[in-house]
């Protein structure tokens, strides 16, 4: 006999280009919009939790610690990239950074250009610039997150969506 265990038999996989990350200094939340890093090749989010074991006569007892989160971003360096410069200055000055993880494959039920998102605050904890003779310059960033993040919906402009993936363009001038 066949039993269903809430398996999503007809689910679709989400392409990596549909998950985008947007960044903004917390100090600029009333004056500026969040931006994506140009030429992103890979992003990731990790959540981990350590635990301690205590030996008892009945076996070990585990005590979970506090969850810690990190977001990583790898991109090719764009000439004159002001966002990367701004993020590095924020690292030097211990400034809090806002980060949105947005799923462009899941539009919100209401509102134009709104998508399922997770919001975080944290600090840039590592920046690495790698250059070799054969490839483009690569920039890797690591953000240490505070708290667990909050689920919600984020607005992603048409321009930001176009940064994430090629969008079809007509042969006529824009607005014609």
Where would I find each of the regions flagged by the language model?
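Solvent-exposed edge beta-strands and adjacent loop segments
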Residues: 10-76, 124-137
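Structured, beta-strand-rich domain cores
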Residues: 59-117
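Residue-level signal for secondary-structure boundary sites
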Residues: 81-83, 149-153
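Short beta-strand and beta-hairpin "edge-sheet" elements
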Residues: 102-151
